């Protein structure tokens, strides 16, 4: 669905009074120190967009890392109330009271499903304006679109949402999971759930993939013979040895296809690989392994491991996701 500018109305008329007060306060604070982005550009970014952004993009791996960190901070963390996976763990993304502002914007969006106030409110935050003023307009569009991808996680029509997950000890028993909010059937494509992919050169891997365990997801493509950075909402999909869904990559994005019928409350999972969690996934803590007494739940030293059919792309993870309270 596309949204066109609103017949010459000032964008401020589209927002609740409290949102206007927050934006006005932030603008007053930053005017002396920032080269202000023209209001017309903010209006363009906030009013003329698609609820499901185009699949292709021109983000570099570094840009995708920063865009993803910012978007998850603004949207996901504001709802879950803890910091989810970040590529740049030491970077601070929000200033002062902006965490509260983000929480209020997300509370309002989840209630009224109005895109423009949420987008406009985020883009007018001091920290966001400081970040995007350095970007060319086409990159501002891509940053805005990445925020929209995460807003879809909380849209009533998405058919899924995100919840806290306490299953995995390697995450300190505080992570996230995606769950269905409606029935899905084998072969369905989850339209509002996607991953964003960037090819990684050897130099990119040396620059981005930190040995101390930066949080990121990587897929190795046998077809392309290179590693690809995988972020976006799809990065929150957990592994299961009997998955409900699968990754389907195409170009610079990947969509999610349903493998088994699901009802509301079922977790959206994919298969990462037969040795992702050690030999024969001996350290796997997925629900299927718990039910079948395999992986981390096995009581024997040796076990047979019935593997799902081989994937053309093997998902490899170089670091563990850490979580800290906001």
From Swiss-Prot:
EC number assigned by the record: 2.1.1.362
Region (Disordered): 294-313
Keywords: Chromatin regulator, Chromosome, Methyltransferase, Nucleus, Repressor, S-adenosyl-L-methionine, Transcription, Transcription regulation, Transferase
Pfam families (UniProt xref): SET
Database matches in CDD domains: SET_Suv4-20-like (cd10524)
Record flagged with keyword Transferase: yes
UniProt family annotation: Belongs to the class V-like SAM-binding methyltransferase superfamily. Histone-lysine methyltransferase family. Suvar4-20 subfamily.
Protein name per the record: Histone-lysine N-methyltransferase Suv4-20
Taxonomic lineage: Eukaryota, Metazoa, Ecdysozoa, Nematoda, Chromadorea
Originating gene: set-4
């Amino acid at each position: 669905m596309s949204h066109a500018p609103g017949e010459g109305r000032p964008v401020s008329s589209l927002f609740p009074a409290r949102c206007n007060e927050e934006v006005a306060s932030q603008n007053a604070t930053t005017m002396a120190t920032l080269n202000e982005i023209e209001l017309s550009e903010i209006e363009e970014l906030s009013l003329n967009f698609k609820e499901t952004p185009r699949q292709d993009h021109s983000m570099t791996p570094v840009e995708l890392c920063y865009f993803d960190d910012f978007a998850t901070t603004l949207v996901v963390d504001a709802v879950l109330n803890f910091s989810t996976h970040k590529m740049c763990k030491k970077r601070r993304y929000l200033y002062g009271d902006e965490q509260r502002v983000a929480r209020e914007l997300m509370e309002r969006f989840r209630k009224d499903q109005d895109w423009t106030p949420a987008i406009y409110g985020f883009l007018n935050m001091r920290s966001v304006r400081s970040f995007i003023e350095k970007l060319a307009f086409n990159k501002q569009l891509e940053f805005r679109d990445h925020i929209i991808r995460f807003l879809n996680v909380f849209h009533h029509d998405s058919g899924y949402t995100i919840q806290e997950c306490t299953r995995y000890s390697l995450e300190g028993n505080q992570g996230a999971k995606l769950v269905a909010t409606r029935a899905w059937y084998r072969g369905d494509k989850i339209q509002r759930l996607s991953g964003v992919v960037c090819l990684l050169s050897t130099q990119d891997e040396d620059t981005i993939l930190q040995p101390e365990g930066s949080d990121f997801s990587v897929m190795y493509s046998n077809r392309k013979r290179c590693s690809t950075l995988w972020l976006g909402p799809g990065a929150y999909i957990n592994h299961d040895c009997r998955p409900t869904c699968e990754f389907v990559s195409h170009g610079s994005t990947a969509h999610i296809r349903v493998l088994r019928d699901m009802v509301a409350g079922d977790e959206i999972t994919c298969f990462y690989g037969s040795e992702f969690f050690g030999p024969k996934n001996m350290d796997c803590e997925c629900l299927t392994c718990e039910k079948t007494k395999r992986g981390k739940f096995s009581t024997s030293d040796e076990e047979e491991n019935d593997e799902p059919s081989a994937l053309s792309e093997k998902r490899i993870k170089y670091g563990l996701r850490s979580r800290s309270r906001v």
